[in-house]
């Protein structure tokens, strides 16, 4: 079964503009693709057991983060990684969900929402607005 996750990005403060710089897909379940449709990022995956990541950077504040969305055992999941080093691209982070214990746990938790603050106190959140089925929707909120 093919899964899609449509993601809307909200930036709630003008103190640092985040721009998308990278999109990745994991290779399991026939991998996936990213599209942009009507201002939303749309991740299409070949089946359960894969994911995709978006990396955002703010040149204004020297901050970056990776937001990852996926389906595991037929349920959606999400995670956000902040305080990235230059070597921590979305490509690096995305593959860690399939073999690095701390990232594996985030995938296994199958959360419908997740929020975290970075070292500078900025908040980031993912909230799935459609949590079941094969046509999922989520909001990515940058505080």
Curated annotation (Swiss-Prot):
Domain of life: Eukaryota
UniProt-annotated binding residues for beta-D-Gal-(1->3)-alpha-D-GalNAc: 29, 48-49, 73
Biotechnology: Lectins can be used to recognize and purifiy specific glycoproteins, and for the purification of cells with specific surface glycoproteins. Has potential as anti-proliferative agent. Sold under the name lectin from Agaricus bisporus by Sigma-Aldrich and under the name of Agaricus bisporus (Mushroom) agglutinin (ABA) by USBiological.
GO MF assignments: carbohydrate binding
UniProt-annotated binding residues for N-acetyl-beta-D-glucosamine: 82, 103, 114
Key word Repeat present: no
Keywords, alphabetical: Hemagglutinin, Lectin
Pfam families: FB_lectin
InterPro entries assigned to the protein according to its UniProt record, in alphabetical order: Cytolysin/lectin (IPR015926), Fruit_body_lectin_fun (IPR009960)
Something else known: Each monomer has 2 distinct carbohydrate binding sites, one for galactose-beta-1,3-N-acetylgalactosamine and another for galactose-beta-1,3-N-acetylglucosamine.
Stated role: Lectin that recognizes O-linked galactose-beta-1,3-N-acetylgalactosamine, a disaccharide (Thomsen-Friedenreich antigen or T-disaccharide), present on cell surface glycoproteins. Can also bind galactose-beta-1,3-N-acetylglucosamine. Does not bind monosaccharides. Can be internalized by clathrin-coated vesicles after binding to surface glycoproteins. After internalization it inhibits nuclear import of nuclear localization signal dependent proteins. Inhibits proliferation of malignant cells without cytotoxicity for normal cells.
Subunit structure: Homotetramer.
Family that this chain belongs to: Belongs to the fungal fruit body lectin family.
Name listed for the protein in its UniProt record: Agaricus bisporus lectin
């Amino acid at each position: 079964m093919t899964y899609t996750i449509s993601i809307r990005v909200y930036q709630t403060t003008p103190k640092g503009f985040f721009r998308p710089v990278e999109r990745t897909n994991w290779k399991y379940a026939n991998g996936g693709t990213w599209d942009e449709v009507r201002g939303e990022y749309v991740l299409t995956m070949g089946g359960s057991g894969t994911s995709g990541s978006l990396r955002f950077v703010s040149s204004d504040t020297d901050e970056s983060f990776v937001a990852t969305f996926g389906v595991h055992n037929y349920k959606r999941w999400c995670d956000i990684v902040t305080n990235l080093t230059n070597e921590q691209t979305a490509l690096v982070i995305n593959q860690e969900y399939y073999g690095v214990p701390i990232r594996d746990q985030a995938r296994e938790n199958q959360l419908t929402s997740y929020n975290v603050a970075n070292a500078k106190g900025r908040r980031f959140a993912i909230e799935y607005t459609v949590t079941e089925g094969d046509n999922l929707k989520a909001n990515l909120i940058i505080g």
